[in-house]
């Protein structure tokens, strides 16, 4: 099993990887299909005149709060998650709403009225995944020409229904034979076994796998871009205050907290317990930016995007021997763990609840931090397990479908748990009672058994017990 570090960490925009970045990418894919010859045309002069989209399952229930409709419009206008300008998004959407047409580059333009051609269908879920969407293209006489179903499966990943079936079939195959990477581990046990046999660290094995796809220089440059985007997101979040969009009137707090912490900096250096405050404010800064639709990095999702940047910034500020190579090793180790979780369970809140989002992020962060603090592979696996174990059963019940409450503070606590898990693991010898693989399987089973009310539908939990103001 190979999942690139650049599939785990993707630069995009908020507020959600599954409900914003995924639908935008699905719209991109459908545009490419419309221009291709991969669908039967009744005759050579038949042209696409209009497009319609329907959103299903969790996308329908929480799509308005997550900006899913906006993401679809942007994607149909040819905008991509990693390149769209957050400052231009409103203007692009206004243009489509006023004209009733989408005009992506390289296309003739198609009729698309968001109020009638973009449907939030809460009644009929699609069978493959909770985050389903259907794109259809019609000719001028309203005859259906081509239709595709896409699923946003978490972390910005998008697949067709056929690809989803293949992906699930691949999970049932034995791990190694056909994979053209030197270390095709698909489980934590395989990862540890390969590390022991090779004498390499987890980061070194992950690097060797990545370098079958790119040069060492390209890999390092890509890792630098990922951290630069994460770090910039923290910095932006620490400078902005005011009310976040969406109607809940939730106020940004990261800047005010950061200002107070700077005043107390000397005492913070003396009393390491207060490092938790810094961890929290870094994570909150990222997730406040995410909630506002700013530039973020999936880590492994947008809803959990604050945990890993916060712990890397913690590593920079509280460990005098940090260096850029350490950040590279952190990201590679975290991506190795994230890939195992995604392969064997899920990182989607709509599939397994928030244990799959913040829980996975905390496990990845704990593993990365333990690695750069000198942990053995066994201690790294232990750190990831501790962090994930203590997120098991966590629900995804965002109020009003917005990635704000409880999501922003939850990232802060996820970062604190990750650091604690790494510290506990480093105090041991790597031998522990619950294997990471067993914990991941428990998370998968728990998510499967969890009521749909608690899986990003905003129909249970805090979403129905707290009055929206």
Region spans (language model):
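Short, mixed-charge aromatic SLiMs
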Residues: 49-63, 95-102, 330-343, 385-398, ...
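Hydrophobic alpha-helical bundle architecture
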Residues: 322, 333, 339-412, 424-433
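Alpha-helical support elements that line or immediately flank enzyme active sites
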Residues: 18-35, 309-321, 366-374
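Accessory carbohydrate-recognition regions in carbohydrate-active enzymes
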Residues: 13-60, 128, 159
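C-terminal regulatory domains involved in ligand/effector binding and gene-expression control
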Residues: 81-267
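Accessory "access/gating" subregions that flank catalytic or transport cores
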Residues: 213-353, 461-469
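Extended hydrophobic packing segments that form well-structured cores
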Residues: 433-469
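Conserved phosphate/anionic-ligand binding catalytic regions in large, soluble enzymes, centered on
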Residues: 9-29, 291-311, 354-362
């Amino acid at each position: 099993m190979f999942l690139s570090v650049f599939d785990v960490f993707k630069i995009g925009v908020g507020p959600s990887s599954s409900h914003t970045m995924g639908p935008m990418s699905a719209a991109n894919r459908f545009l490419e299909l419309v221009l291709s010859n991969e669908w039967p045309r009744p005759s050579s002069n038949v042209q696409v005149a209009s497009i319609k989209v329907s959103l299903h399952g969790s996308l329908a229930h929480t799509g308005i709060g997550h900006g899913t409709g906006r993401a679809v419009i942007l994607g149909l206008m040819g905008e991509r998650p990693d390149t769209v300008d957050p400052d231009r998004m409103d203007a692009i959407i206004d243009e489509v709403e006023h004209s009733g047409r989408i005009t992506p580059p390289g296309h003739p333009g198609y009729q698309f009225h968001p109020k009638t051609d973009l449907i939030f269908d809460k009644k009929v879920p699609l069978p493959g995944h909770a985050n389903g969407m259907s794109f259809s293209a019609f000719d001028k006489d309203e005859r259906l020409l081509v239709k595709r179903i896409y699923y946003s499966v978490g972390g910005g990943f998008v697949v067709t229904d056929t690809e989803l079936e293949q992906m699930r079939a691949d999970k049932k195959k034995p791990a190694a034979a056909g994979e053209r990477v030197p270390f095709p581990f698909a489980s934590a046990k395989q990862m540890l076994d390969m590390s022991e046999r090779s004498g390499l660290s987890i980061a070194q094995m992950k690097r060797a796998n990545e370098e079958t796809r790119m040069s060492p220089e390209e890999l390092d440059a890509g890792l630098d871009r990922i951290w630069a985007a994460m770090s910039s997101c923290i910095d932006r979040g620490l400078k902005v205050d005011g009310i976040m969009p969406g109607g809940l009137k939730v106020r940004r707090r990261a800047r005010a907290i950061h200002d107070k912490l700077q005043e107390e900096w000397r005492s913070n250096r003396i009393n390491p317990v207060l490092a938790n405050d810094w961890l929290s404010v870094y994570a909150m800064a990222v997730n406040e930016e995410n909630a506002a639709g700013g530039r973020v990095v999936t880590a492994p999702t947008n809803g959990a995007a604050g945990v890993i940047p916060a712990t890397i910034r913690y590593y920079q500020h509280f460990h005098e021997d940090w260096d850029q190579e350490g950040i590279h090793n952190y990201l590679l180790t975290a991506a190795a763990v994230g890939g195992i979780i995604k392969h064997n369970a899920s990182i989607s809140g709509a599939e397994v609840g928030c244990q799959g989002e913040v829980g996975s992020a905390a496990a990845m962060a704990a593993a990365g931090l333990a690695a750069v603090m000198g942990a053995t592979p066994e201690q790294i696996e232990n750190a990831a397990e501790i962090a994930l174990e203590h997120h098991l059963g966590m629900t995804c019940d965002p109020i009003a479908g917005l990635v704000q409450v409880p999501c922003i503070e939850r990232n802060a606590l996820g970062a604190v748990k990750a650091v604690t898990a790494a510290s506990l693991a480093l105090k041991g010898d790597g031998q522990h009672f619950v294997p990471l693989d067993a914990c991941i399987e428990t998370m998968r089973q728990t998510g499967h058994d969890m009521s749909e009310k608690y899986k990003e539908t905003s129909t249970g939990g805090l979403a129905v017990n707290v009055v929206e103001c």
